[in-house]
Structure formats: C-alpha cells, structure tokens
Amino acid sequence: MFSPLTKRAKQSSRNEKTPRNRVPPPDSPVTPATQNRNNFISDRPATGTPAPWAPRLSVLARVSPGNNGDKGVDSDQLKPVFVGEFPQLLRDEQSYPGDACVSGGMDKETCLSWFITGSKVFVWSHLTTLPSRKCVVLELPVVVLVNEESGSGLQDGKSWLVNVVSWDTSAGAATRASRSRSPVGVVMCNRKTRAVVYWSDIFSGQEAAPAEKARHLIKRQSNGIRSSRAENSDLNSLITTAVAAAERLCIAIACSSNGELWQFTCSPTGVKSNQVQLNISSSSVSEGYPRSLIWRFSQGLARESCWEFLMLTDCDIHCFTIEPYPDLTVSEVWQHEIVGTDGDSGIKKDIASQKQIWPLDLQVDDQGKVITVLVATICMDRASSSSYTQYSLLTLQHKSEMRFADGREEKVLEKQGPIQVIIPKARVEDKDFLFSMRLRVGGRPPGSAIILSGDGTATVCYCHGSSTRLYKFDLPYDAGKVLDASVLSSTDEHEYGAWTVLTEKAGVWAIPEKAVVLGGVEPPERSLSRKNSSNERSTRDETRVTPYGVDRTAGRENSDIQNIEDKGNPKMGFTRQTARDEESEALLGQLFEGFLLSGKVDGSLEKLSQSGAFDRDGEANVFARKSKSIVDTLAKHWTTTRGAEIVAMTVISSQLVEKQQKHENFLHFLALSKCHEELCSKQRHSLQIILENGEKLAAMIQLRELQNMINQNRSARFGSPQAGSEDQVSCALWDLIQFVGERARRNTVLLMDRDNAEVFYSKVSELEEVFYCLNRQLEYIIRADQPLGTQLQRACELSNACVTILQTALDYKNEHQMWYPPLEGLIPWHSQTVVCNGLWCIASFMLHLLTEASRIDISAKSDIYTHLEVLTEVLLEACAGSTFAKLEREEENKGLLNEYWTRRDTIFDSLYRQAKEFMEAEIQGIRERTEATDEDIFRNRCSNLISIAKRHAGYKIMWKICYDLNDTGLLRNLMHEGVGPQGGFSYFVFQQLYDMKQFSKLLRLGEEFQDELLIFLKRHSDLVWLHQVFLHQFSSASDTLHTLALSQDEESMTTVEERTGPEPEDVQPTFADRKRFLNLSKIAYVADKDADSESKVKRIEADLNLLKLQEEITKALPNGEARNRLFRPEELIETCLNIQGRWTAIKAFEVFAWTSSSFRENHRSLLEECWRNAADQDDWDRHHQASTNEGWSEEETLQNLRNTALFQASKRCYGPTRVNTFDGDFAQVLPLRRENPEDSTSSVEDVLMSHKDFAEAGKLMLTAIMLGCVEEEGIVAEEFSSPME
C-alpha cells in the first residue's frame, strides 16, 4: 500500500553470503560514528543515533506548542513511537557477520519478544526500559540444527515456530504488568523436521528438554495424501497452553500443509508426539491447508476443565476441544463453513468474477466471541480481462455457547456484518506470499486489525461504519523488516492496547491510535507487499508527498473519523480541538509568556474572552489545558539510558521546583488579568482543576523528597560491601513508581521511549494513578512470600507515601484557600473513588498485619499502629469528602455512605483492640501499679483515636472508650463536642443506655442535653411517658401510655433506622406490657385530677377488657399464631366468625360491646353478620317442633331459650346488665325491632327474617332476643307477638 520513506539501496551487497570484511554492517543501528564513513543516507546525523534518524515524538513534545500550533495536524503525531531497543546481547550478536536468516515474534499474554539468529534465541520483555537486564539467551541443541540429508546446519530462523507458555494463571490485564517476573516456558518446533525443543522455565537457567527429531513424522504419510503433498508438509501454525503449572507440563498443537494435526506433550523430562485423527476427508482439503490454529479463549478465560481451539481450512472453521483427563484427548466439537453457497454464513463462492478464495488467517477476540478471518479472493476484471486480488475481513460471532450432538446440522457462527473489503483491487500475488500473511486483532483504535506480510510490511486496517482506513507502518530502510506485531496489553480490564511492532533491526515500536485514525488513507488499488504495481505511483513520488508513508489530507477528509476524535480520549493524552480552541490556547500561551517577561497583563481578559477562552468548562478549558501542560512538561535533559539511577539525580527535584514556580506565576497571571474572577464565576470546574494541579505538584515534590530520604536510609543500612546497589534502590515506593510509570507508558504510547520513573515524575496531573496501582498491584509490591518484617517495612513505606501525598495536597489547599472557587457539588481529586479504594487497600493490608500478633514483636506492631493511625485520618477524610460531594449534588449516596461507615468502624475497632494490647503490655512493665496509673496509660493510648473519631462520628469507639474508663466527665465532654445531625453523639449515648435498659441514667443525663433527649424520645415513645411524669405532665403521660399500649406493630418500639445493633426478631410488646401501660395510664389520669378523668378511665378499662378478650379468643388459634400481635376490633370479630362456635359467636358481641358507638356505626354490616351467625348456632326448627308437641309453658319457654345464642347476645348488648354502659347503646345503631313499620332503619328482627327457619320458628327467635333485653321477673309472653301474626 505505502512505500518506504527513503529509496532503498540495491540489495546485491546485502545478499552476499560472505561479507568482505568482519566489521559491523553499515546499516547497523549501533554502528559507531566515524567521520570518514560513506553516509549514503542524506539526513543521518554523524553521532550514530539509532534508526530512524527523525527525532522521536517524545523529544518533539518538549518544544513549545506555540511553535507549531498553526500547522494543523502535526506530522510528528502520525509517526510510530519508539518503545524499546534490542537487548545489548542481541545487538552484539547482530554485529557479527553471517548468512543466518533471522526471525522473531511477540507474545501478547506475557509481553515478551523473541528473536532467533543463528543457533541462539533471545527472549526479553519489550515493556521494560532496560531489556538487557532481563534478556535470556537460549541455545538450540546441536541435534536439531543438523539436516539429516545434507548434514549441514540449519541456520534459517524462519523455519522455527515459537510459542511462549505462561505458568501464571491469573486472569486480566491488570496482572500482566507483573508477568515479566513470572516463570514462563518456551516451545519451539521446526517447520520442516518437526523437531521440538522445550524449555520449561527460561528464567531459571535450566537446559533444554530432550529434543525429539521425529524422523518418522517426516517420512510417515497419512492415508489418502498424495506424495506431492507429503513433500510440501511444512508446519503452518503452533499453539501451546499450560496443563499443570506445578509440574511445568504443557501441550502444543501443530498443523501441517498436508492436512495433518499433531499434538506434542512437553514436560521437563521430554517431549511426546501424537497425530490427531481428523474426521475430515484429507482429499477435500486444498494444498497448503490447514493454515492456522488459535485458542478460542485467552489464557485467563480458558476453562480448566477443557481447552478449545480453532483451525482454519480452505473452506471451514473447525473447533476442537482437549479434555485433560485422563490422557489429553482431542475431539472435534463443531465446524462452520465460511466458503460455500450460503452467503449468510460466510463468503459465497461460484460468483462470476471469482476465480479462487483463499482464507489466510484467523484471530479471536479476548472474550472468545468474535472471530475475524483474513481472506484473499482472486477475481477477474471483465472489462480488461485481467486478474486482481481483493483482500477482505470476514467477522463472525458465536450464536450460543451450546454444544451440539453428533450429526446435528446447526450453525454455530453467524456473520457480524457484511464482509469488509479492505483493498478492492490489488496485484495478484503468488501462493507463497499469500500464505505468509498473518492477522492480528485487539488493538487501538477498537475494531482495527493489523496485517503482516511475508516480505516484512505491516498495515493497520481500521473500519468505522462504512469507511475503511489503512495505515502503513514504515521506517527507514535499515530498520529491516517487520517480524511480528502484537497489542500492548492495557492495565485496565477489557480495554484495548496500542499496536506494537517488532522490527528486524530497529527494536520495538508502537503505533499511536491517533496515527491510525488521522493518518490512515482510503484503500488503494495495490498490494500489501513492498513490490510495485502497474496501477500505483512511483515510490519516489509517494515519499515526496507523504512523510512516513502517511497522507495527511486524506486522513482529515472523513467526517466519521473526526467525530470520533472530537470526543477525545483522555487516557491517550490527546483531544481533538477546534480551530477556535487552538487559537485561544495559542493566544493564552503568548500572553502568559509576555507576562513572564514583562509582568504586564494589559487587555488580556478582553482578548481571551473574544477568542472564546471561557467557552468550555472542565478539562477542555484552555486555562486548564495550559495548567496541565505546565505540570506535565517533560524535561529536556532527562534520558532513558541511565535506568534506575535516575532516582538519584537532583535534576528531578529541581525540575519539579521549576514547574511549581511557573505554575505559581500562572496563578498570578490569572489573578492580575482578572481571569481568575471570570473562571470562579463561570468555570468553577476548570479553576478547580488548575488549583488541583498545584496540589499534585506540591505533593509530587514532597514525594520525591520522601524517596530521597528512603534511599539515604537504605544506603546507610546497606552500606557494607556485601550489599548490592540494586537492594539499596529497591523499595516499596520505588516499585510503586515503576507500576505507575508503566501504566502511564502503556496508556500513552507516546511515552514508551521514556523511563518509568521519568514518566511518573513528569505526569503530575495523573497523581491519582498512584492509588489505582496501589489498589491493583499491592500483591506484587508486597509479596506474600516475603519475610514478615519486610512486609511490615514496605507497608509502612507505602502508607507514609500516601499520607505525604494527601497531607501535602491539603496543606496546599489551606494555603491557597482564597484562590478556590465555591466547591459545592465538586468532588476533589483526593476524594475520588480511585483514591479511597487505594487507601483502603493498603489500610486493610496493615490491619491484616496487625492480626499477626504471635509473629510480630511489640515494637514492630507499635510502628505499624502509628502509621495506620495517621493513614486512617487521611482515608476517612477522603471518603467523607466523596460522600459529602455526592450529597451536595443530590446524587444517590447510600451505598457510598454505608461503605464509609463500614470502613470507619472496621479500622476503629482494630485500632482500639490493639491500643488495649499496648496498654496491657505497658502496665506489665510497671512495678508500682495504681488505678490512676493504668487510667493515664489508657488515656494516652486512646487520645489520638478519640480525636480522629470525633471528626468522623466514630460514636461506637468513643462510647467504648468512655465505658471502659468509666469516665462520665469525658462522656459529657464528648457529648457536648459531638454535635451532629439527629442528636449527634448524645443520641448514640442515649441509644446505648436504652439498649442496656438503664432508663434512669438516660433521663438524668438528658437533663443536661434536653434538646438531644427530645429528638431521641420522638423515636422512642415507650420512654416519652417517663419523661413526662418526671416533668409532672400526668395528662400527657397518660395519653402517651394509652397510645403506646394500643400501638400497632409498625408503630411500636424503636424504628428500624435507629437500631444500632442486632435486635431480637420479636420486638413487639407483650400483652402483659400493654396491660401495664394501660394501668399506668389509668393511674396517671387519676393523678391528674382532671374533670374528664372518669370517662377516660372507663375507656382505658374498656381497652383492658378488649385485651382480655383477645387473650381468650386467640387461645383457640393454632399455637404461636399472632399471640402477641394486637388485633384491631374488627379483626378480632372476624376471627370469632371464622372459628364457628357458640362461644366465639357470643364473644363477638362482647367485642362490639367494649368498643365505641362510632365503631358500631361504621361496622353495622359486621354487626348484622354477627346476628346471623348467632342464629345459626341453634336448631330453631327442633325448638319449634318441641314447643308445639310438648306445649311449653312460659317458664319452660324461658328456660329453653335462655341458653340460645340469640338470648345471650341480646342480654350482653341490650339488657339492663349489658357490658358497656358509658358510650351509648346498641339500640342507637341496630334496634331489636322497628317501632314504626314504615321506618327504613334496619333492626335485628329484619336480620333474623332472612333466616331459613324464621318462617316457622320466627316467634321463638323474637321471643329469645326480647327476653334477653328485659328483666327476667314478671315476663308476660303474650306481650311479644310476631308482626307476622
């Protein structure tokens, strides 16, 4: 697609097998500078700077933006970024002449690169800034380097397939930063001889495992395979995975061009091979297939029970699984046709213009859900009758995770979208070139892929919507070919990393996302190789137009790409600005530089306002961006060649001080120009960011001083000759700096050529990343296998660093308080969730160390206790700030508040327990002990804890300390100081006394805190009456007791929100409690001597009778059912009706009798139902027959009817001895009989008339109710006649 920047020299001299003299080749990047050398590169400097000679972007970033702000998209931003040099051992090996053909590769999981030259294999981490320190050189055994037929040595590095096996089973990108220290194995397999070499742990220095030459694998031919294919049976692909990490056992799967699939079991004792029998017909597989193998899931997501891998053939994708037990059996799970007659499932063949379809390679995303296939299609142009190649990407996704039974014809995959054509018309290449192409996915920008060709080119394809952009990675010619590409693993889970490229001679490079998005061009009609084509421009013309092979104008034509960049990506370190923003930022830079020179700010506010400098708020504001550029400036004289020694340089401290001075001048510029007032009123967030940059810069300076002090202390401690310098430099803070710098380098590839420490001390505005890495990487900074004393020391170092950062930031804020805008609703950076989580991570680890009481001496525990005490204060301040900001913004903060309370109480409880242990230890060391001495020791130990608890409402620990000291004076002082919402600490103390049932102490203490006591009593009504009695408010106390006795479940006792500890499941007052409350209420009414006290007392007595009735009635209910629950009168009556009995039928009327007339009026229908139920309790037809046959006299009638339910109900409700005589009678609601037949009022007689036996026994029914309502003496039966007569 693109051509190299510089025209390449003729290759004849470079292809000579024997060099003319034994000197390094002239194109070696490490060739020493010589003044008399023939420089055939015009722009190459005489200093021997490694290729390419153009300045690196990170160096150009030091230039003031004012110099190039008017150039649009800077071409330097579209260049690749240098990541790391080759290890020096590899450079030395490259300097020797020879005819060996080199090869190399990169592993995404372990971030390791490997390079084969001659008989040596170099393996190193391409992330470290000093690769030479971690470079491992592996020697290939002689037995695998001898060709059996010719006896010559095999020096072709391209004949080897290499895979790295990670024994670290941890999942996620967050742990990959530490994998360079983890043990890894290497498996190598020769494409031609099938020889396998295995190193189980390359970092341990052990020898290679016995190599299997596998002669029978070469000569053996499977059934159905022609001899011509057997000759071309090179292995195409190799994949490996760990089986048992402890035993260093792994398996490797390889596929060959003759359709065979081989399985190798590798262990430290040897390598075993086994051919996998495929169920596909060998004759149906085209020559050169299967092409590639790949695991369906990444190592972190792979299931331990089995492993699945995919195999690409000329028309299908096959999925296989490996069952680890009992003998690592490989079996096919499913297959999916990608080239066939069904265009919906893949690529439709037999189209008129198609001649041949070549699936070249496939890749799977990290989640194992999306499969991408690189496809080359040979087509015929009907107009010119010429052939051309069309390159495209086929994207498939899994429909489900189901496994299908044998013979079941269902599609497992489906097309994610239409096939994406990346090059519509290209030159027709030979088969070997097509098969040399490789595909990589998973890099930035999301959705992009990189295509590697056999001649050493790399092209990034970025498809966005209907648009496709191609970016060609190209360096000056002496960089050599591109050997492999990978993804720079991000430190964030489920995030994409930048593309990294391994070159033949220029080390490792990265392709920034911005370069791909802005520097990509439309797909041309040309090949992906370096060869020229008839329809492309000359190389010389192309290089004159596009530096580094990038057409800048084409990169800005597509509006979709620009829309993506307008949103920006802060983690990448760039945001697309409008022309107005760029003008404003340039103007601000000029005005500020003028202020630094002259001290004048004439008209700055008006000029900046007209330029739109105040249009944006937040990080996009030009003032905030200027502040960020000041604090994040890279020093010109910082280099990456000195590695860890950079921490000893005073230049870091002086550079930070220079930044601080410049930032202070920037604040003064804002104040004098009145821009500060404008920002304070309109862009509060922007002003907050500016001042927080000052906080972070001050904190970074103090952190640097802390590191200097740690280094000095360690130097004094390890000053003996036996101590190594590496031990002196290594400390917890240094390791944390490395992790933070590494994370910044990964997220911003423009910094990949910088040292971790340099990046850390330069990226001041991202200081909160310290706490992110502390939360994610603590287990690697403080390892479990380290001695306990070392863990303690490193934990204290990290705690001290965190406290230094936050305390310095708060001090800066206090000193510049007048500069800050109103912060309502703004979350400070030191109160963000990432900071709180990082602080809690180290605090919880220190709490864990404190629990190791038996293994830690008292002095070490005292040291960590002191550090934890200080750390607790800054942790709680951070959590409180986050919670209050959420509250001010009226956002949901319940979860955050609960987390804050939990962390606070956990730390306080642990610190208090430890303080008591220290007190006991101190007391044991005193010969003359007194009670006062013990108390003083205890107070001194707890003084700091009380101080912190007061500021963060640690009421629980404050109460414990006062209770254990038995100090009422201290308790009262804290109650006066602990003022807060809902009564503050006083409310908590009252609650504790209430739970302990010390009511008298509670009320006596409440005399001093009356307002707080009233708040408490509103939620504890069972104590209100006691307070009212104490104030001689007897009437109010009686009403309170009466209400309390009849309170329902949801109203009784303490509300759930106010409970501070676990409550019993049954917190309802019992019947005995309710009776006691009612009796106390009656006593209080009598003591009040109110004129209306008699009626109130009768009402109380009625309620007592209702309680008694409920006790009697609920005895008939099943055991335990609502025994203590207070029934409402209507519920009690309905219960009586449901029980269906004579006794309960009569009790229902008694319940009515003890209620009020208003209740009876409101429940008239329920009363009528009670009368119907009472009539049903007797056999009135039998009574009628007996009275007729036996001729009952008046006395016999009375004797027989007085036992009926109707008689008893009438007697209790209407008789002279009725139950309730003070609140009206039943006749007002439901009379026995209507006095006036024309009256519409219902009566008991009307209710009974609906009874089934009323027609015959109606007279007896009426007689029963009328007999019950009068005196029994002198009854005249004839007076009661039925209206039916």
From Swiss-Prot:
Organism in which the protein naturally occurs: Arabidopsis thaliana
GO molecular function: structural constituent of nuclear pore
Superkingdom of the source species: Eukaryota
Keywords attached to this entry: mRNA transport, Nuclear pore complex, Nucleus, Protein transport, Translocation, Transport
Compositional bias segments (type: Polar residues): 31-41
Homology family: Belongs to the nucleoporin Nup133 family.
Name the record gives this protein: Nuclear pore complex protein NUP133
Feature: compositional bias, Basic and acidic residues: 523-544, 553-569
Disordered: annotated span: 1-53, 522-580
Subunit structure: Part of the nuclear pore complex (NPC). The NPC has an eight-fold symmetrical structure comprising a central transport channel and two rings, the cytoplasmic and nuclear rings, to which eight filaments are attached. The cytoplasmic filaments have loose ends, while the nuclear filaments are joined in a distal ring, forming a nuclear basket. NPCs are highly dynamic in configuration and composition, and can be devided in 3 subcomplexes, the NUP62 subcomplex, the NUP107-160 subcomplex and the NUP93 subcomplex, containing approximately 30 different nucleoporin proteins.
Major localization class: nucleus
SUPFAM superfamilies the record matches: Nucleoporin domain (SSF117289)
Subcellular location per the Swiss-Prot or TrEMBL entry: Nucleus envelope; Nucleus, Nuclear pore complex
GO process annotations (BP): mRNA transport; protein transport
